[in-house]
């Protein structure tokens, strides 16, 4: 029996050789592999396959998956493939071919009476996003992030305090305890970073033992060589990550001074281009070091005609500057440079910048990490053409490079890749389903720990789920004890050994960060390029390995106004 590709795609989704456009970008992906057995596909519905004695077996709950996502197109750093995905006990149990093993061949995911089904036909499945630059200014950020497809938030803060408005620090054991207790209320994986600015180890050690999964050095607290050295020494001892916002004003040294203070030790450099803060004008040099794990924040993603003007106003507010003070204005203007922002676009495309995050409410938008990433990818595709590794007529390699920037690479950087960050067997089932036309803009379904935590949903009083008004709403995994069972709170090993979860009465599942101190940039997937960066101190022009990096700002972006008319 034969079926046309068009009819097959309509029924079961695209298969090997088919191409799919991502939203309204010019990025096309091509299916590399299909795990199905043609003619044995499983699909739920009236008159369909997943029925008793057909695609559904008689096996007990222990032998079948709890949830099956059928015929989904997976986009992850490791591939672009079509598969059934089985979830069990909150984790990804299998990727492959689902069905009834009693009557169907090559089944590695058994369906039974205890199996729920999510139809993935014609849908794209990705890992939940990981945002590693969160200012916890207001709790409403968390729902905003979740509805955008982010399922893990890492950063610091205590609410709308002046310190938190500027820095991602949950300062001290008392504040750490309050924030860990607050994290129980949310269907979101959360980890908090303490304040790393101290020249003696004891004030930092007590924060790690209180639950901090990392330490944040910020110039507003004084990112001096002494505090950098001390902070990295504590991190090495306790296996937690260090993130840094370096010294924009070059008060305690220049970029070479800071890089020297690292002493080859692993560090995550926030907004490494510099508009978000850091040695002016050449902090961007840091992305060429093997021990530096560089990220961007999303307001500079991608470079557009509005980027410069927007940043000046944002900076004055976020860093408590006064526009009537000439020195404050000069400080702001020194950070915002067309030349380095343009270079940042290209360095992302080359894989020299490895991660993208938000800088939530502190010069960044918490709900736009995913969108800004794909807008950058599309801009670079249009301006620079296919990457080496892309196939004929597809952008598969570029897509893998960019999705890694907000999934697996932040997970590796912060020691949580054993739990989250990819669509792989054994990982926590934090998954996002997208309609291709809305990919990267508006997800359809967000799963946390194998349960549906958020979704597009129509009128609750309607006779079917789809009537307007359709908007994002929290689902059952966002409520009661379900959120405790399906979301993670990350803490340090030292805090676990100190009994912090029991002392604070934490209800969410606890996971420990590990392997933070031996990560090198070469470990960051598809984003491990180590260029020799030069910045002209007069013109701010950037060269990588002797090649000038410049691109024009975009006048129009995809994934923008046409998606947000309602």
Swiss-Prot record:
Ni(2+) 1 binds at residues 133, 135, 216, 359. Carboxylation allows a single lysine to coordinate two nickel ions. Heterotrimer of UreA (gamma), UreB (beta) and UreC (alpha) subunits. Three heterotrimers associate to form the active enzyme. GO terms for biological process: urea catabolic process. Its EC number is 3.5.1.5. It comes from the Bacteria. GO terms for molecular function: nickel cation binding; urease activity. Its main location: cytoplasm. InterPro entries: Amidohydro-rel, Metal-dep_hydrolase_composite, Metal_Hydrolase, Urease_alpha_N_dom, Urease_alpha_subunit, Urease_AS, Urease_asu, Urease_asu_c. Its cofactor is Ni cation. This is Urease subunit alpha. Keywords: Cytoplasm, Hydrolase, Metal-binding, Nickel. Coiled coil: none annotated. HAMAP family: Urease_alpha (MF_01953). Binds 2 nickel ions per subunit. The lineage of its organism: Bacteria, Pseudomonadati, Pseudomonadota, Gammaproteobacteria, Pseudomonadales. Substrate binds at residue 218. Transmembrane segments: none annotated. GO terms for cellular component: cytoplasm. Belongs to the metallo-dependent hydrolases superfamily. Urease alpha subunit family.
């Amino acid at each position: 029996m034969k079926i046309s590709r068009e009819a097959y795609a309509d029924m079961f989704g695209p298969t090997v050789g088919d191409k799919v456009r991502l939203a309204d970008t010019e990025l096309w992906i091509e299916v590399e592999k299909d795990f199905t057995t043609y003619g044995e596909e499983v699909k739920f519905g009236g008159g369909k396959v997943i029925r008793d004695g057909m695609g559904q077996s008689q096996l007990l709950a222990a032998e079948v998956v709890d949830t099956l996502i059928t015929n989904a197109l997976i986009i992850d750093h490791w591939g672009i493939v079509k598969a059934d995905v089985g979830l069990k006990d909150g984790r990804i149990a299998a990727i492959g071919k689902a069905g009834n093993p009693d009557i169907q061949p090559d089944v590695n995911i058994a369906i039974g009476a205890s199996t729920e089904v999510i139809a993935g036909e014609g849908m794209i499945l990705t890992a939940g996003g990981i945002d590693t630059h969160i200012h916890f200014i207001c709790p409403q950020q968390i729902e905003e992030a979740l509805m955008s497809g982010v399922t893990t938030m890492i950063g610091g803060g205590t609410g709308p305090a002046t310190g938190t408005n500027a820095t991602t620090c949950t300062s001290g054991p008392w504040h750490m305890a309050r924030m860990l207790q607050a994290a129980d209320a949310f269907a979101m994986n959360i980890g908090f970073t303490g304040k790393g600015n101290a020249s003696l180890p004891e004030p930092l050690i007590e924060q790690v033992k209180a639950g901090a999964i990392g330490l944040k050095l910020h110039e507003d607290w004084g990112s001096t060589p002494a505090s950098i050295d001390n902070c990295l020494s504590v991190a090495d001892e306790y296996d937690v990550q260090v993130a840094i916002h370096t010294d924009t004003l070059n008060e305690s040294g220049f970029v070479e001074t800071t890089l020297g203070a690292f002493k080859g030790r692993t560090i995550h450099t926030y907004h490494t281009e510099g508009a978000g803060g850091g040695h002016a004008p050449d902090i961007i040099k840091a992305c060429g070091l093997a021990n530096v794990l560089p990220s961007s924040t999303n307001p500079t993603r991608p470079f557009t005609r509005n980027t410069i003007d927007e940043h000046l106003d944002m900076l004055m507010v976020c860093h408590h500057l006064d526009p009537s003070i000439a020195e404050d204005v000069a400080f702001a203007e020194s950070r915002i440079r067309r030349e380095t922002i343009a270079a940042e676009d290209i360095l992302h495309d080359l894989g020299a910048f490895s991660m993208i995050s938000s800088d939530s409410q502190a010069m960044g938008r918490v709900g736009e990490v995913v969108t800004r990433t794909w807008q950058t990818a599309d801009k670079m595709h249009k301006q620079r053409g296919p990457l080496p590794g892309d196939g004929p007529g597809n952008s598969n390699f570029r897509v893998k490079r960019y999705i890694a920037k907000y999934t697996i690479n932040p997970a590796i950087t912060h020691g949580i890749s054993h739990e989250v960050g990819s669509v792989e067997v054994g990982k926590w089932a934090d998954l996002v389903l997208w309609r291709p036309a809305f990919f990267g803009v508006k997800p359809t379904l967000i799963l946390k720990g194998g349960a549906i935590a958020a979704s597009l949903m129509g009128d609750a009083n309607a006779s079917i789920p789809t009537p307007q008004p359709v908007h994002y709403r929290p689902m059952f995994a966002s409520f009661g004890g379900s959120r405790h069972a399906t979301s993670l709170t990350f803490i340090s090993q030292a805090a676990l050994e100190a009994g912090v979860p029991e002392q604070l009465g934490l209800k969410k599942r606890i996971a420990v960060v590990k392997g933070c101190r031996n990560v090198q940039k070469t470990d960051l997937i598809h984003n491990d390029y180590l260029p020799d960066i030069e910045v002209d101190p007069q013109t701010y022009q950037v060269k990588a390995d002797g090649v000038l990096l410049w691109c024009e700002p975009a006048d129009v972006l995809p994934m923008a106004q046409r998606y947000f008319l309602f």
